[in-house]
Amino acid sequence: MDKFVIVFIDDILIYSRTEQEHEEHLRMVLETLRKEQLYAKFSKCEFWLRRVSFLGHVVSEEGISVDPSKIEVIMNWERPRTVTEIRSFLGLAGYYRKFVQDFSKIAGPLTNLTRKDVKFVWSEECEKSFIELKKRLTSAPVLGLPDGTEDFVIYSDASRKGLGLSLIHI
């Protein structure tokens, strides 16, 4: 079931490619809930949605994207002036790192400022990093769902400044 269900605390999201597939997935989840004597309050359930906001993401037929309300928060984020503010920004930005190629490399100058032995000095490099992360997060792509019938290949690369991985669907 982990290929079509996301469970977070008391929220369950079931996603599928087709209506027929969704009917089967829904049946499987409801049977599992009944078998385990778990109950869903019908008035709080929504079925057959084509688009849903879930944990800061929008899931639709096109794929998964950043929730527009979060994009607005990122766009309006003012330049961090303390280590705490940098950590807060990196916390939000890091949650969406899967949408940003080279995230760790771009965030490096900001991450370095959060170290205990580093004096807080906002440099031009930090400013560029902050602006680039905001730009990339506010123009993030829609991530598609793999069809699961073909093979995957993992490409990796590492250096002293970052680590990169790509999962390629062939």
Put a short name on every predicted segment.
Residues 1-168:
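Retroelement reverse transcriptase polymerase core
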